[in-house]
Design a protein with these regions (language model features):
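Gly/Pro-rich interdomain helix-loop hinge
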Residues: 271, 275, 279-360, 403
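ATP/NTP phosphate-donor binding region
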Residues: 1-86, 341
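Short, amphipathic C-terminal "tail helix"
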Residues: 359-405
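Glycine-rich phosphate/pyrophosphate-binding beta-alpha loops
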Residues: 139, 244-282, 375-379
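Glycine/threonine-rich beta-strand-loop-alpha-helix active-site module
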Residues: 70-176
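Carboxylate- and glycine-rich phosphate/diphosphate-binding segment that chelates Mg2+/Mn2+
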Residues: 147-253
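Flexible, glycine/charged-enriched surface loops at secondary-structure junctions
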Residues: 204-213, 228-238, 253-258, 276-279, ...
Length: 405
């Protein structure tokens, strides 16, 4: 028996933030990140709407990009002290992901982070609080998903928390918030969304309910992302919807090894100057993984359907896969995203020599490959890689070499 889970309510369109007025409760804690929600006035509006709904409001701010286990624990302590019955997570993927993990710890103070990471092993939530997610970026779609990504910096590993229990009760998808994104963030979150949709469509867990969401999201992203990046605000608004559709798809169809690799490389080289930003990692790895997965006939055929829907041409599935890969690489060029780790600069832009030295990459490769194979997203990938194949695939992603295995 399969399951399809979405938030109970999804408010969308310009001005949807006002839906906070309709929430019923006594106390709400707002979890936010680095200040953009405050800078552009959205945090003040959220506080005002919640107070209008009759709630006492507390703010937990300063959640960092790629949130840490320590931040999760601090936030949970704040919740335990304040005792909210609504958790309002506001911003990009990081504050929403962090707030989801805080929610688990708030409901179950004795639970460990290791227990949280057991796939679909979270006990029932909502005994203390409900959850509302408000997205300000157009990529992660965590406002509608059963996933959260938390980084253990002591190990240099990002861990996915996966359970339908952490699907928000209410999602607010207001494009006004997304219009404030800086250009680089538009690129990275947009390619994250494209990866979500493509991986969901070829996942072994895809179904009739997820396929339409995934394929339509792909077409919308094809039509809207580059123009959104170049400043078209109508396309920016449309991308906010497209990424949400992709999120609905992958939350129920699951993902694949593009995400497994992104999770396990993202913080693996932080001691050498920077993270590999999640959306940029997905963008670099997606063409290589398509080439790898397409050795499986079923996956190849489904990539062919994607190419057809995008109008890319091709006389057979082999040609269609090649054209899809070519298209995605061109999209990376248009978005100023490098093609491989070797050319990934500390600021995420293409550079002759990136921040990850070759000898460091090769030294850490076996462990990264092992961790990627063990990632929660690997199980639904259409082709299961061996340790040797994962190491070879990661090398292709480092050097930008052909995937011929």
């Amino acid at each position: 028996m399969a399951r399809f889970t979405l938030p109970r309510d999804l408010y969308h369109g310009k001005g949807a933030l006002e839906a906070l007025k309709s929430l019923t409760g006594k106390k709400a804690i707002i979890c936010v990140g680095g200040g953009s929600m405050k800078k552009f006035g959205f945090l003040d509006r959220a506080v005002s709407y919640l107070k209008e709904a009759g709630m006492e409001v507390q703010i937990f701010e300063g959640i960092e990009p790629d949130p840490s286990v320590e931040t999760v624990m601090r936030g949970a302590e704040a919740m335990l002290a304040f005792e909210p019955d609504w958790i309002i997570a506001m911003g990009g993927g990081s504050p929403i992901d962090a707030a989801k993990a805080m929610w688990i710890k708030y409901e179950y103070p004795e639970i460990t982070f290791e227990d949280m990471c057991k796939v679909f092993g979270i006990p029932p939530l909502r005994k203390k609080a409900h959850f509302c997610a408000i997205s300000s970026t157009s990529g992660t779609a965590t406002e509608v998903t059963a996933f959260s990504i938390i980084t253990d910096y002591s190990k240099g590993i990002k861990y996915p928390i996966a359970d339908f229990e952490i699907t928000p009760d209410v999602a607010i998808v207001d494009p006004d918030l997304a219009e404030t994104m800086p250009k680089k963030l538009v690129a990275h979150t947009g390619m994250d969304a494209m990866t979500h949709a493509i991986e969901a469509y070829v996942s072994t867990a895809h179904c009739d309910y997820t396929d339409p969401l995934a394929i339509f999201a792909i077409k919308m992203i094809q039509n809207d992302l580059v123009e959104s990046y170049n400043g078209d605000m109508a396309k920016r608004d449309s991308m906010h919807n497209a990424q949400c559709l992709a999120g609905m798809a992958f939350s129920n169809a699951l993902l694949g090894i593009v995400h497994s690799m992104a999770h396990k490389t993202g913080a693996a080289f932080a001691d050498y100057g920077a993270h590999i930003i999640h959306g940029a990692a997905n963008a670099m790895y997606l063409p290589k993984v398509i080439a790898f997965n397409a050795k499986d006939p079923t996956a190849k055929a489904r990539y062919g359907v994607i190419a057809d829907y995008m109008g890319l041409g091709g006389a057979n599935d082999d040609e269609k896969v090649e054209l899809l890969i070519k298209y995605l690489r061109k999209m990376n060029d248009d978005l100023n995203i490098p093609h491989c780790i070797q050319h990934y600069g500390a600021d995420s832009y293409p550079t002759e020599q990136g921040f990850v030295p070759e000898e460091v990459f090769l030294e850490r490769l076996p462990e990264i490959a092992k961790n990627a194979i063990g990632d929660a997203c690997t199980g639904s990938n259409p082709r299961q890689p061996s340790q040797e194949e994962m190491e070879k695939l990661l090398k292709c992603c480092y050097y930008d070499t052909e995937v011929d295995f």
